[in-house]
A protein has these predicted regions:
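Conserved alpha/beta-hydrolase
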Residues: 140-147
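Flexible, membrane-associating and regulatory peripheral segments of lipid-active enzymes
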Residues: 2-135
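Short, well-ordered beta-to-alpha junction loops that form the rim of enzyme active sites
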Residues: 100, 147-148
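Short acidic/His/Gly/Ser-rich catalytic and metal-binding motifs that mark active-site loops
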Residues: 104-108, 151-156
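Conserved small/polar residues in nucleotide/adenosyl-binding loops
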Residues: 175-177
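Chitinase-like catalytic core of GlcNAc-active glycosidases
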Residues: 168-172
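Charged, often glycine-rich, active-site loop that binds/positions anionic groups
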Residues: 153-165
Length: 177
């Protein structure tokens, strides 16, 4: 019985070592298999010139209120004084923040904007904004748009579809404020 157990342990060790070797040799190919969409690129309809007047296309902008993820602050620890910036010394400035790609779905090359977008990408984008845009809370205005971000796999391939997806993410999201 002990011999069978040792054979099993040896088999598991060999399997882990073989898996690690395969991963080291083929990690780029494995990332492409896992993240690059296999679907054809379908061009997205350009946004209207005034599309960003709609508050639904913004994660953060003046007037959103307490649900603004870019204005998030961690809770104060008990007994710690609240840090309040002196408004008279702080210069007025605005921050325009474009969050990194949060769309990991292989279903399409670009994240949808219609019907609230991809729920998982929206959740991740809000986390990114809390962590990356909230340090700019001293700004008088923080603007963070929703955009047709390219899927993560578009950055991992040399295929023309990937380039088209990246171009669509940034070229079609021109913002006229």
């Amino acid at each position: 019985m002990a011999r069978k157990f040792l054979y099993f342990v040896a088999f598991c060790i060999v399997l882990v070592i073989a898996g690690r070797i395969v991963y080291e040799l083929f990690q780029e190919e494995l990332a492409e298999i896992a993240l690059v969409p296999s679907a054809e690129f379908s061009p997205v309809k350009p946004l209207e010139a005034n599309a960003y007047e709609d508050s639904k296309l913004w994660y953060s902008r003046p007037g959103i209120g307490v649900k603004d993820p870019a204005r998030w602050q961690p809770p104060l620890t008990e007994g710690a004084p609240a840090a309040t910036p002196d408004a008279t010394k702080a210069p007025r400035f605005a921050v325009f923040f474009v969050h990194p790609t949060s769309y990991l779905n292989r279903a399409s090359w670009n994240a949808p904007l219609e019907n609230g977008g991809d729920p998982e990408a929206e959740r991740i984008a809000r986390i990114y904004l809390r962590g990356m845009a909230s340090p700019f809370n001293a700004a008088s205005e923080i603007w963070a748009p929703r955009y047709r971000q390219a899927t993560m796999g578009a950055f991992l391939t040399d295929a023309t579809e990937g380039k088209k997806a990246i171009d669509a993410a940034y070229a079609l999201s021109l913002i006229h404020i």
